[in-house]
């Protein structure tokens, strides 16, 4: 069953899987104020919906997302202060969206069927997992326009090694799916007619795990990455103890010892 939300379409193709599909092909699925607002609203709602175990971000058309809408940015220059108040609002909103994806207790998968540039590439780098078509391409081309991709850089440098990130940022060149997988920007790529099924299969596999364990694990993953080695082990040791005291962990261990499938809480 589909729920039309203008430029964002949501459906539940498998149990526990919420798919959010950007459908503003005229703008190249740009991360406009409206698109980001709808994504933020949908992800916030999914975060507290127990029926949602995992989220897929996908798109219609040959462009996953072209980044911010440059026509809107140009028009904003006609406003007060050469558009500075609008620019601040736009990038604050984008930062909020990216942080929401990271802080969402549900894993978020990017399904990239085409081109992802600038903030669109940033969104790919921000997602927990990313799967692309073999024809997909990625770039942070702002430098070609005299506008360095500084905010996409935040996500990019957390997804790939510095030298690879700097090469993308300084040249603005496209990389293909083979290179994107090689540097760690995406997990894997498939032929376009296989992409949806492969992504859904992975999403379903994760959706069948303990929601509690997945949520705790995702939070711990990003939290410990900011710590030094000793702090990280101290923090994750406490998380392991807390996790062991949860009912799902008790059930999972018991099921393993009894050689049966665990019955986790829904």
Segments (PLM) and residue ranges:
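Crotonase-fold acyl-CoA enzyme core
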Residues: 99-212, 246, 251-254, 260
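Conserved CoA-thioester-binding segment of acyl-CoA-metabolizing enzymes
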Residues: 1-60, 99
């Amino acid at each position: 069953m589909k729920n039309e939300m203008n430029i964002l379409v949501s459906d539940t193709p498998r149990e526990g899987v919420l798919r959010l599909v950007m459908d503003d092909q005229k703008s190249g699925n740009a991360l406009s104020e409206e698109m980001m607002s709808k994504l933020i609203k949908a992800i916030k709602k999914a975060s507290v919906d127990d029926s949602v175990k995992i989220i897929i971000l996908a798109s219609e058309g040959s462009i996953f997302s072209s980044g911010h809408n440059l026509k809107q940015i140009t028009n904003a220059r006609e406003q007060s202060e050469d558009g500075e108040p609008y620019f601040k609002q736009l990038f604050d909103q984008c930062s909020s969206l990216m942080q929401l994806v990271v802080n969402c207790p549900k894993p978020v998968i990017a399904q990239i069927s085409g081109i992802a540039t600038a903030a669109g590439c940033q969104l790919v780098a921000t997602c927990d997992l990313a799967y692309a078509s073999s024809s997909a391409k990625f770039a942070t081309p702002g430098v070609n326009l005299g506008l360095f991709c500084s905010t996409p850089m935040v996500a990019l440098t957390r997804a790939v090694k510095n030298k690879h990130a700097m090469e993308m940022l300084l040249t603005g060149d496209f990389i293909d799916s083979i290179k994107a997988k090689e540097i760690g920007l995406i997990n894997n790529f498939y032929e376009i007619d296989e992409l949806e099924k492969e992504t859904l299969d992975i999403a379903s596999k994760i959706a069948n795990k303990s929601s509690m364990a997945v949520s705790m694990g995702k939070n711990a993953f990003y939290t410990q990455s900011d710590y030094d080695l000793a702090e990280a082990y101290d923090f994750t040791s406490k998380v392991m103890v807390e996790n062991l005291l949860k009912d799902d962990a008790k059930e999972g261990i018991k099921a393993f010892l009894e050689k049966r499938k665990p019955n986790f809480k829904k």
